[in-house]
């Protein structure tokens, strides 16, 4: 089904457990997606001999391609533990992490208290990751959509998503609204001193 002629980008197998009126989504989701139609930052880094590490459902999203190492996770705490260990040990050049709990467990389920607690957990884990980063590391946090747990709907919401980039001894600067993830890709190219093949503009010098 996931072929360009059909324009079906992804088929998701999403298992649940529990009884009627009390179903819970498990972490055994499987995404069957169409391969990216062009170069991505992941494929570009991989083809330039940089080691890549996918944490979470990254492997599914990119057709199980262009990853030196990939691991499946059981929630945000587990994913951030993998990130902490990798940031500390430094075995790969590029780490791509997908965190799902705020969306899957709380946003879609209209659970603002759970969302709040999940965000606090992420905040606690992030501090440990920042502590083990070297001065040569760059970390970028962002998202591809919102899932407002208070809007009375169970679908994705359309607000602007945050983007926070951090380096030790870096600047504390607001860089304004950015249009498109390609600006992140261009910044990563700049960070690894590769030619920028994407339409965006690097903001590395403002971090």
Language-model features, listed with the residues they occupy:
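Feature captures the catalytic ectodomains and active-site-proximal regions of enzymes
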Residues: 4-207
């Amino acid at each position: 089904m996931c072929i360009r002629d059909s324009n079906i980008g992804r088929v998701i197998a999403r298992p649940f457990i529990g009884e009627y009126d009390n179903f819970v989504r498990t972490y055994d989701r499987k995404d069957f997606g169409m391969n990216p139609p062009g170069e991505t930052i992941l494929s570009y880094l991989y083809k330039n001999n940089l080691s890549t590490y996918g944490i979470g459902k990254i492997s599914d999203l990119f057709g199980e391609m262009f990853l030196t190492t990939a691991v499946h996770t059981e929630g945000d705490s587990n994913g951030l533990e993998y990130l902490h260990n990798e940031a500390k040990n430094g075995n790969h050049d590029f780490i791509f992490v997908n965190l799902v709990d705020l969306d899957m467990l709380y946003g879609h389920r209209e659970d603002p208290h759970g969302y709040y607690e999940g965000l606090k957990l992420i905040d606690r884990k992030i501090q440990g990751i920042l502590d083990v980063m070297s001065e040569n590391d760059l970390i970028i946090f962002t998202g591809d959509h919102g899932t407002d747990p208070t809007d009375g709907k169970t679908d994705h919401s359309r607000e602007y998503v945050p983007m926070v980039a951090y380096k030790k001894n870096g600047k504390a600067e607001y860089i304004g609204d950015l249009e498109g993830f390609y600006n992140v890709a261009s910044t990563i190219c700049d960070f690894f001193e590769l030619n920028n093949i994407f339409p965006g503009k690097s903001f590395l010098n403002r971090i």
